[in-house]
Design a protein with these regions (language model features):
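Alpha-helical scaffold segments that flank or form the walls of functional sites
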Residues: 99-123, 205, 288-295
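Catalytic domains of carbohydrate-active enzymes, especially glycoside hydrolases
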Residues: 31-43, 113-125
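Short, conserved phosphate-binding/catalytic loop or strand-edge motifs used
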Residues: 131-141
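Second-shell residues forming the walls of enzyme active-site clefts
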Residues: 6-8, 19, 31, 45-65, ...
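Short, conserved acidic/polar surface loops in the N-terminal third of protein domains
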Residues: 81-91, 137-139
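A charged helix-plus-loop insertion that forms the helical arch/lid used to bind
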Residues: 87-103, 146-148
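Preference for extracellular/luminal or secreted protein segments
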Residues: 1-36, 252, 262, 280-393
Length: 393
């Protein structure tokens, strides 16, 4: 008996994370929520104040209740921070954290503050930390977003950030698997390539991700980076490959299976933004990339801006699930994704009632301020003392 079409749509929609413009639930947002999208990502365009963010998230969660909605934000610190002064604590760049006298302590403090402030405004996940190793001075994407230039330094700081952030009830996300630190292309504009052998990747790029997994990280984000060294190498000491015919990591079964099987990560794997220029010329477009990612065991696909792209990904996933009559391919993968997403939600995602309580607490705080919850002078002092300087954006 064929499954009901709505079942396929529900399985597909829960794998789509969408973004939208505006400070409240608008028509675009409402449509994606009503379709059953499992996650939403906020940007600076969605932020006016802590009370407004908390209320926005509470309204989105109420709209989909009793289903849970994962709300995420890029709150790395430095140049990638959607929550900023004057309302939120200024978080320094990962480079500044890594340069502190006690980088592990500094990362722990920063992770604690990020987790505290995200939870206060009903955000369930921060897309941090970056666990790339900054080994290429010409890399315009990573640079000061990395904790350091060695795997040990990056892994130690990342582990401290993850544990502290998640102890506040906010999921962390290690990125950008399997390493974006030694690339020169900006994947926002073009497809990048990591030309190293598997042996080199195991020595430099992969160890910080191992540390992140050992720290219990809830999610790993996969980059739109070609990694020919992971595509069935003849030996671990293969000469460096330069072929550009390999798929992006976000669509590669070989790259994602290495994370799952060799690194031992059993949590949620998500793609980088499907609207990035890196996928602009991909065969089959965003839809085919999403289907390829599904078969590679990617659980969640980010489509951060255009409703058209979000629907393209959702519809392609739905069609793939509907075509899988015996349930051995796309349907099985989507069902596995649902279970991993549910496990993350059980651990970190607030439901509608808890979100409403958070929103009311901030809205009713004395004098209309929120310093008890976010932007506390004490937290600014803790960050400043740990990092040894006034944080710079």
């Amino acid at each position: 008996m064929m499954p009901h079409p709505d079942d396929a749509r529900a399985l597909a929609a829960q794998m789509v994370c969408f973004g939208f413009d505006g400070l409240e639930v608008n028509a675009h947002c409402a449509r994606m929520l009503d379709l059953g999208c499992g996650a939403v990502i906020l940007f600076a365009r969605n932020v006016a104040s802590p009370a407004q963010v908390a209320r926005l998230c509470a309204e989105m969660k109420r709209r989909v209740s009793p289903r849970k909605l994962l709300v995420m934000v890029d709150q790395e610190g430095g140049r990638v921070a959607r929550f900023r002064e004057p309302h939120f604590t200024t978080i320094p760049s990962a480079e500044a954290v890594g340069n502190a006298a006690d980088a592990v302590h500094a990362a722990r403090v920063v992770g604690d503050v990020v987790g505290k402030e995200c939870r206060a405004v009903n955000v369930d996940m921060t897309l941090a930390p970056v666990v790339d190793v900054n080994t290429n001075p010409n890399n315009v994407v990573i640079g000061d977003r990395a904790f350091g230039t060695t795997p040990d330094a990056v892994g130690a700081a990342a582990g401290a950030f993850i544990r502290a952030c998640q102890s506040r009830g906010v999921a962390a996300c290690a990125k950008h698997w399997p390493g974006h630190g030694d690339t020169e292309e900006d994947t926002h504009a073009a497809l990048a390539i990591t030309k190293h052998s598997l042996a080199r990747l195991r020595d430099v790029e992969i160890p910080p991700f191992v540390d992140a997994v050992k720290a219990g990280v809830a999610s790993v984000l996969v980059a739109h980076v070609q990694v020919p060294g992971m595509e069935a190498p003849k030996s671990e000491n293969d000469a460096e490959k330069t072929e550009t015919s390999t798929p992006p990591a976000s669509c590669s079964a070989a790259v994602v299976s290495f994370l799952r099987e060799r690194v031992g990560f059993g949590g949620v794997v998500m793609s980088d933004d499907m609207e990035m220029g890196a996928l602009a010329n991909a065969p089959g477009g965003v839809g085919q990339c999403a289907v390829d990612g599904l078969h590679a065991t990617v659980d969640l696909f980010l489509a951060c801006h255009a409703e058209r792209t979000q629907l393209e990904a959702l519809d392609a996933l739905r069609r793939a699930i509907e075509r899988d009559v015996d349930g051995s391919g796309a349907r099985r993968r989507a069902t596995e994704a649902r279970e991993r997403l549910r496990a993350l939600a059980d651990a970190f995602v607030d439901g509608a009632d808890a979100a409403e309580a958070n929103a009311r607490a901030i809205e009713s705080s004395a004098g209309g301020t929120t310093r008890e919850y976010v932007g506390a002078p004490e937290d600014a002092r803790r960050v400043r003392d740990a990092c040894g300087t006034t944080p710079r954006l």
